[in-house]
Amino acid sequence: MTDKLTSLRQITTVVADTGDIAAMKLYQPQDATTNPSIILNAAQIPEYRKLIDEAIAWAREQSSDHAQQIIDATDKLAVNIGLEILKLIPGRISTEVDARLSYDTVASVTKAKRLIKLYNEAGISNDRILIKLASTWQGIRAAEQLEKEGINCNLTLLFSFAQARACAEAGVFLISPFVGRILDWYKANGDQKEFAPSEDPGVVSVTEIYQYYKKHGYKTVVMGASFRNLGEIIELAGCDRLTIAPSLLKELAESEGPVERKLAYTGEIQAKPAPLTEAEFYWQHNQDPMAVDKLADGIRKFAIDQGKLEKMISDLL
């Protein structure tokens, strides 16, 4: 009998949400996603020590200023880990822009181009890279500009329908709507503590976004992210892509039985509405307390891990 991971691959592109090389080799995903937390964890893996040493040596060659060396080494390490992962996957690596730049369009574009340049200098073309940006208004504007220059983007920390709509209207390549973190919020802030997979608020959110994109003919790829359990993944089978942590990839691989397509759009393509203005975006996003909380929380957490990574690098310089 077929295992659920093999079955899921027939209807959805499976992406690994990790920097763990062993997991890549084992589960052979199409693509991989990283973020500051994943890079921080990966930096603790013994096999990656040489990548850290190389990044530090490179940074010392670029500048004699300690603060600049930290920035350079951190960027280079994220790219070095991405390069190792690219040896193991046929598709794309997602590398994230510093979360502290989430409200600065110009700085986000500059950082994205720097990361792309480092990949290009290592022989990797743009079609194997996705630049991850937080789905703030400023992040979406940065992505809109980058897409026009041939740099594809992955808009992350996406919790509200307004964020999803603005991303599609900006023509971004891919969005990562978070499932598990939405569930976390509702469990923490409401009376209901258990949800059937089909009623899971994160699943409902991604389903709504998927249907809206397909109904209006948007090309933006929907990649569900941040899963807490197998039920969420099974309920989103048919989504364009799903990025899954190794523990859940393992669970899927060890579970027998078919996975049925749950997401599909069979209706006619309808006209696209007029794009959201900045004021409309903020008003609509602000109507969703969960999304407001989780976007801010996600940016803070990624910024904290970015700081920890820089501290680790600083101590080694």
Curated annotation (Swiss-Prot):
Q: Which GO terms describe its cellular component?
A: cytosol
Question: Annotated pathway, please?
Answer: Carbohydrate degradation; pentose phosphate pathway; D-glyceraldehyde 3-phosphate and beta-D-fructose 6-phosphate from D-ribose 5-phosphate and D-xylulose 5-phosphate (non-oxidative stage): step 2/3
Tell me the Gene3D superfamilies matching this sequence: Aldolase class I (3.20.20.70)
Keyword check for Calcium: no
Please give one Gene Ontology molecular function term for this protein: transaldolase activity
Q: What are the EC numbers?
A: 2.2.1.2
Name the UniProt key words of this record, in alphabetical order: Cytoplasm, Pentose shunt, Schiff base, Transferase
The annotated active site, in chain numbering, is 132
| Compartment annotation | Cytoplasm
Q: Which domain of life is it from?
A: Bacteria
- List the Pfam families: TAL_FSA (PF00923)
Q: Which reaction does it catalyse?
A: D-sedoheptulose 7-phosphate + D-glyceraldehyde 3-phosphate = D-erythrose 4-phosphate + beta-D-fructose 6-phosphate
Question: Could you say which enzyme class this protein belongs to?
Answer: transferase
Assembly description: Homodimer.
Q: Which family does it belong to?
A: Belongs to the transaldolase family. Type 1 subfamily.
Q: What is this protein called?
A: Transaldolase
